[in-house]
């Protein structure tokens, strides 16, 4: 037990001292998950396990860096715990679905889907109604920008002391002065002005308080949160081949977005969330039964056409053609 505690402390120290290397590790783990997909039997489950682990690793490392840098989330401790649990569920939901299908079959798979969606809905309702958290965003916790947030200042960089950069007279290239060059492990290779702009923008995003929602916006958000449960309930009533669950979910999503479309004064992150939800309406082209009857043949034909006539594109489109049927059948990929 003592060895595990020491190992944990060493890992925390490594993350705080080498945030850039930690980010590279997270990217490597995520990339490894892509390489595993479709390579052998049960590779999809293993690939998703590695991908879920990479997302949990990002969440863990961000928590370590926030604690070290004292950059707490601008919310209460109880709300932070709810956001963390919601983030964990979003990280592992696909693997839980695939694992349940492998172990318990279709009945176990749908039971796990229903339990996960119910848990997420309860957490989001608490955030919306109890904590007045405003618009629900994805991901629930803003990931840290390692280049701008995880770099401790090396000395006083205030403009009053000395210039942070030098502009070449002939090349107009911006170069950091020697006095403002940070230590090697935390060095940022962009121009100082770029870093400052990103720091300011990311700081505003992290510290921005959610926009208070009126009755209309609260109803819209309630519909958005309830949509997965309504869709699952309609699937149980009318079956997976019926158009009614597809139409019901689409109407609920469009209604929610329509009620939110006139809201002014949203934060940058909330505006980005609304754009994300609007773009996700395209997923209805990939959701059954529309996909089975209309989209599948056309999408596969287009991918095959690109693979046959555009050099190099086949390296991407052929694996995509192989994986698309598997992806489309996973509930949390297409409907989550």
From Swiss-Prot:
GO terms for cellular component: cytosol; endoplasmic reticulum; endoplasmic reticulum membrane; membrane; peroxisomal membrane; peroxisome. Interacts with PEX19. It is found in: Peroxisome membrane. The lineage of its organism: Eukaryota, Metazoa, Chordata, Craniata, Vertebrata. Residues 1-84, 132-336 are cytoplasmic. Pfam families: Pex16. This is Peroxisomal membrane protein PEX16. It is a multi-pass membrane protein. Residues 221-336 are annotated as: Interaction with PEX19. The keyword Lyase does not apply. It comes from the Eukaryota. Residues 142-171, 184-210 are annotated as: Disordered. Residues 144-160, 195-206 have a biased composition (Basic and acidic residues).
